[in-house]
Amino acid sequence: MPTKPAVNWKQTLDVSVICPVFNTPPGVLAVAIRSVLSQAGPHEVELILVNDCSTDPATVAALRDAADGDGRVYVVNQDRNTGPARARSVGVASARHEWIGFIDSDDLWPEGKLDQAASVLQEWPDSRWIGGSFATLLSDGTLRPAQRLTAKCPPSQVGRTAQRLCTPESTRVLVGSWHPLGTSLFRRHLITDAGDFDPRLTYGEDWLLCLRISLLAPMDYINAETYVLRRQGASLMRSPRRLSAKAVEGLQAARRDPALRIARRELRWLVYGGYKEVAMNNALNGQKLRGMLFALLALTVDPREVGELLMFLRLLRRNGPALACGLQRYSTAEQLDFSSIKSLE
């Protein structure tokens, strides 16, 4: 786990933590819950578990037991499955505290996360957004740190505990460097002021909200891990829906947003890369015709890249490891294998 920071009791944080839950295995959910409730210090924490109409009786029972076992845990039951965007919004609406944090039901908060944030607030009392880096916990137990955000800051914005990233620099940095929503803590009003989570999006609704928040407030960025992303088992990030246009909807929404025109060049390249990623993974999963379609959509974003389209079409003659190896030249995105799933959406 990331190193626990020095304790600073001079500043406390009252935080409502939102966690959407849909059929999460009880053992996995219990670890996520414990990582939030075990945060040391005098911070007041409430954990809001939004049950997104789970159908697994074991998950439903685990949610009930969590609320019965700790007065800081509240369960909000939805009568239909709405997806993480709407579930998070419901959680925020139910929150009591000024600061809002997030965790996915299969991820972790590292030890000392709130202590780190409290130290930032001690140095920057006007802080409205406290962010940080993350690490990925692999299935073999290996913890892989992510690349940290880097941005040019004047000396006045570099503090002892964090550096203050302001727009447009912060917006452009966030466009090109995805960080999980759970790395950040927000003052509640920022979420509302930025328009809340877009319930129409399956992917990228959290990233899009952070981009919009970056236009409203600086991010006080801690150069340390404030979140642990688990790559174990099934999740939306490893769903066959990653092979559909839904995987690019959030990117397209950002590109169409007039307020984000300051990052239009970066967003254009991101959409182009998103279509290439979907094209590649369709080809790897036996959907070569669909892959061709998404490769053509990528070309509509940047018609100058005919050479990359021709390379992709040539690679489609290959199969198996030869195809996977060749496609690494077409897209550097993660290659996903859904061969164990009988039917792809």
Regions from the language model: what does each represent?
Residues 51-62, 80, 104:
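A conserved acidic beta->alpha catalytic loop
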Residues 78-95:
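Glycine-rich, basic loop-to-helix element that forms the pyrophosphate-binding segment
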Residues 70-71, 86, 114-190:
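Flexible acidic/His/Gly-enriched loops in nucleotide-sugar-dependent glycosyltransferase catalytic domains
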Residues 225-233, 238-265, 288-301, 337:
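Catalytic core of nucleotide-sugar-dependent glycosyltransferases
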Residues 100:
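Short aromatic/hydrophobic "clamp" motif used to bind/position activated sugar donors
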Residues 17, 155-243:
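Conserved nucleotide-sugar donor-binding catalytic segment
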